[in-house]
Amino acid sequence: MAPGSWFSPLLIAVVTLGLPQGAAATFPTMPLSNLFTNAVLRAQHLHLLAAETYKEFERTYIPEDQRYTNKNSQAAFCYSETIPAPTGKDDAQQKSDMELLRFSLVLIQSWLTPMQYLSKVFTNNLVFGTSDRVFEKLKDLEEGIQALMRELEDRSPRGPQLLRPTYDRFDIHLRSEDALLKNYGLLSCFKKDLHKVETYLKVMKCRRFGESNCNI
């Protein structure tokens, strides 16, 4: 299966990262440091959930002798690679806070649709039991990032529109090898994208508030 075939290129849409009127009412006003702390904690928790779900899927469905080969093939491409988002801490430190928030919002929003179907794929009682909460947690993190953008937008120039890479849905036919590899690839990309968001938020929080014990 060719890299990139897990996703539909027709689903790429241009998104304007404007915030809806009245959105502020859904997220309480609080000090900027608290907004960053809450966003970092949410991103950390989601990244942990993504990593645990990926490992449990691998342990349950992917034979051990095939994991290295499959990782090399399915991890070759994620749609998030089509946007100029920083790939690590050093790259992130070269971007402004507003740029990092825009990239974070794009990455989070790209997973909202597929994550609505995650719980329909994983019906057992393993770590997949948390999958029905992932969408809700993504929405919470989206609101947190939007709240930060509202706080900072008056001080930063508005950036260009970004392409929002929208991932395909998870495949429910787990008896198919192609479906297994597709879902394996999606979970790998989800884990990578959440790691990026967590890194961006930590970089912003550390440099803005001068924390001496930052772990990124």
Swiss-Prot record:
Disulfide bonds join C78-C189, C206-C214. Pituitary gland. Induction: By growth hormone releasing factor (GRF). GO terms for molecular function: growth factor activity; growth hormone receptor binding; hormone activity; metal ion binding; receptor ligand activity. The keyword Signal applies. It comes from the Eukaryota. Coiled coil: none annotated. Pfam families: Hormone_1. It is found in: Secreted. Zn(2+) binds at H45, E198. Residues 1-25 form the signal peptide. Belongs to the somatotropin/prolactin family. This is Somatotropin. It comes from Meleagris gallopavo (Wild turkey).
